[in-house]
Amino acid sequence: MLNFNDFLDNEDIVTEGIHDKYIFRAFYLAGGPGSGKSWVAAKTLEGSGLKVVNSDIGFENYAKKAGLDLNQMGDFTKDETKLKDELRRRAKRGTETMGQHAVNGRLGLIIDSTARDADKIESAASGLRYLGYQTYMIFVNTTVEVALQRNEERPRSVPAPIVMRSHAQIQNQKSRLIRMFGASNYIEVQNNKRQDDINSDVYKAIRKKLNTKLTSPIALKWIENEKAIIRARAGGKIDKGFFARIFR
């Protein structure tokens, strides 16, 4: 266990989160294959410093380094399939570790999901709210026809029946997602048209949520504690309530 002086000298105790503008915000992205979730996120949240939690990114990087062409998964040998599965597991572990570090610092998050597993989303979002996060859902919607067309155009496509089944499953979860996050924290983006930029109303709605003032007593208390640690480390006065605030 750290003694008090070690505690003040430990650089890991004060996380980077206190210096980030958009701490305690978590944006969930939901939508099926070909919906354009990544494009919507890039157009609305780029430059915000939010940490992207998406195991697909790591998986694709691992596969590329290993020389696996994910467009040819249907033709993989047994050994290639085994390697692909191991790389997927490694990417998920890495994403979980990165996500945990981000949450430890209460950093803002962009969490990529499909919405098929609503139970998992609800559990994770509830956990984040327990820590003081403000959680939002951005539902990126398309018709099934557009989803199928875009899937064919993607570098890594999936079989058409999977796209259709996924689209139907996600549509069936919409009402539950609205209840889960609350109508005021749910933004639906109709993304059927090809365009170079995001609809201005959508952009404004998402940025408004991003800049919403923190109100959670848990979040405000965490910020107060982190500032107290910084002051203590800098040699500032430690008042009588310091230990109670930090160690309660």
What is the predicted role of each segment?
Residues V144-R248:
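Conserved GTP-binding G-domain of TRAFAC-class P-loop NTPases and closely related GTPase folds
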Residues G32-P33:
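The conserved Walker
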Residues D112, R116, R129-R150:
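Conserved phosphate-donor/acceptor-positioning beta-strand/loop module used by diverse small-molecule
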